[in-house]
Amino acid sequence: GLKSLRTDTYSGRMYQKLLAHHISVYSAHTNLDSADGGVNDVLARLLGLTDLKGLVPVAEDKLYKIAVYVPESHGDAVRQALADAGAGYIGNYSDCSFTAKGEGRFKAHEGTHPFIGEIGQVEKAAEERIETIVPESKLRQTVQAMLVAHPYEEPAYDLYPLKNAGHPFMMGRVGTWPTPEPAMDVLKKIKGLLHRDALSYAGDTDVIVRRVALLGGGGAGFIKLAKDAGAQLYLT
């Protein structure tokens, strides 16, 4: 973060001009730092790290359960729509859902266009209750996809917030270096991979590096997390 404002530096002059012209700046670089496939994943792949784990917890994509009641004739269509929208993922499994059969009852009033039954009469319908899990980031699109696939004019559905752990968004990565070797050799390889003329480093260059932590940007405040994660070298 910004710790001083000096006009004799490049960044200081930039801030001075922004303030003088009443310009607000919103920088979303942290989004790329913590996104799956973002800056840190790109760096980790470039360095050849494997067995990757996140370093700094940032947020969690909370989980919801959606339960929808649908006539048996359209159960498969609604299940497919939910899956296509991103619902139903549990670990490395997709298209996860549960179905229970039952009887739905309703009475349509004037001005409605019921898919089943007549206006003014209580109708019984053979229905399925379809349940599946969906992350908050895909909740809106999942509900919309379900509504499009559902034949009813007014589908009945429930949304339940869950206490299950959702997908974590993490800044930084910790991974296994391809071959255990002295830190100085690792630094030389990193310098070449990143096409740098020089690297600044501190610490014992003879230590054998097996795990490497990295965090794009200024990550000096997370050195302890890197050490606790088992890294012998921290790149930031």
Locate predicted features.
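Hydrophobic structural segments
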Residues: 1-236
